[in-house]
Swiss-Prot record:
Main localization category: Golgi
Protein name (database record): Rhomboid-type serine protease 2
Organism: Kluyveromyces lactis (strain ATCC 8585 / CBS 2359 / DSM 70799 / NBRC 1267 / NRRL Y-1140 / WM37) (Yeast)
Keyword Iron-sulfur attributed: no
Family: Belongs to the peptidase S54 family.
Pfam families hit by this protein: Rhomboid (PF01694)
Reactions accelerated catalytically: Cleaves type-1 transmembrane domains using a catalytic dyad composed of serine and histidine that are contributed by different transmembrane domains
Active site: S125, H179
Gene3D superfamilies named among the record's database cross-references: Rhomboid-like (1.20.1540.10)
GO BP term, example: proteolysis
Biological function: Probable rhomboid-type serine protease that catalyzes intramembrane proteolysis.
Amino acid sequence: MNIKQFFVPAGKPLSGLAVGLSIFLTALFLVNNLVYPINEHLLLKPDSLFKFDLNRISLYPLAHLSFFHLFFNVISTFSMIVMFEESHGTLYTGVILNLLAVFTAIPYCLIGSLLFPNVEIGGASGWFFSFLGYFAVKESRVRNSVMITSTFSFPTLYFPVALLFVTALLAPGSSLPGHAIGLLLGYFMGLKENWVAKITPPSFVLKKIETWVDPLINLIPFGIKYYREVEVDRSLEYTSVYLGSESRLPLHNTDTPAEPTFQGNGRVLGN
């Protein structure tokens, strides 16, 4: 697998939301530590749902508690957002990020009010697990397993679950319930993406919004791509993030050597 493709698809500029969000998260972290403790108004509390505190319910992914917390979340979510944004559009991806935050917060608050009423959470790692679950569903339809070593493979669909528990072991202070809820939402989004589309604004609304803010979109620097609604087609089939000869694996063993297959021009997700 070509890891570079996760960050900078060949011959393509960086995606606008992925870059902008990374910069914004960093700026908020600096403001919180140097200017004003903004995290006090962003961290999600289990009682936030019952107080109808919309700031905390939707904005808690923006709050980070340490530099390493910020660094690992920016690095892990960047590639996921790049891939999703390229195939779904910048504005639509922003809507999805907000929906994921809200629909993760609701069950977290319900569970947390009973089991851990005094625990606050923040950070974008829930987004990472949601997108990880989403891409695992899509990838599992192309590759049923991922090669870990030359002799050991792991089911593609359950790889995020393994990573969920590894993360809990390596970072015991992280929110396992929040990550698990985010992962379940990602699985749901991958399995029922047409259902998710029904709770997002219609395409014509997104196009209208982009028309209104077009002067601002045109200010985006060269080398950073804003994927407009008119440029994307969310009905296109998923393309594996694995490149070259690994892009498809057989689902069963065969005793006869496979005949050479035509190697067409591959494309990165969303092209």
